[in-house]
Amino acid sequence: MNFMATRAPTLPPATRPAPDDGGAVVLERRPEKTPPPQMYQVVMLNDDYTPMEFVIVVLQEFFSKDRETATRIMLKIHLDGKGICGVYSHDVAATKVDQVLDAALKAGHPLQCVSEPVA
């Protein structure tokens, strides 16, 4: 089969930019800044059964606290009913809570730990 064009293809006419009349609007692109991620604090709750030494070991092992800092946080938990172990992104905070709860369960202690958004 032979296909024949009925007319030759035409190019669109060349356009020239219009002279600037001073009324042109120039839009500037601003770089978008993503907000920082929501941070969460890991809070350990006091109970009357978990030994203080176990709380200190957990703070050292899972939150990389030195003995003095871990003892200070443990005393805050004991005296105030709760204490902040650290501030992390959502995923890291959730992982740390799970680690603490697993360690407490394996050791037979009722220690509770939660994460809450930082205000």
UniProtKB/Swiss-Prot annotation:
Protein name: ATP-dependent Clp protease adapter protein ClpS
GO biological process: protein catabolic process; proteolysis
Database matches in SUPFAM superfamilies: ClpS-like (SSF54736)
Quaternary structure annotation from Swiss-Prot or TrEMBL: Binds to the N-terminal domain of the chaperone ClpA.
Lineage, uppermost ranks: Bacteria, Pseudomonadati, Pseudomonadota, Betaproteobacteria, Burkholderiales
Entries under PANTHER family matching the protein: ATP-DEPENDENT CLP PROTEASE ADAPTER PROTEIN CLPS (PTHR33473:SF19), ATP-DEPENDENT CLP PROTEASE ADAPTER PROTEIN CLPS1, CHLOROPLASTIC (PTHR33473)
Functional note: Involved in the modulation of the specificity of the ClpAP-mediated ATP-dependent protein degradation.
Region (Disordered): 1-33
Coiled-coil annotated spans: none
Gene that encodes the chain: clpS
Family recorded in the similarity comment: Belongs to the ClpS family.
InterPro entries recorded: ClpS, ClpS_core, Ribosomal_bL12_C/ClpS-like
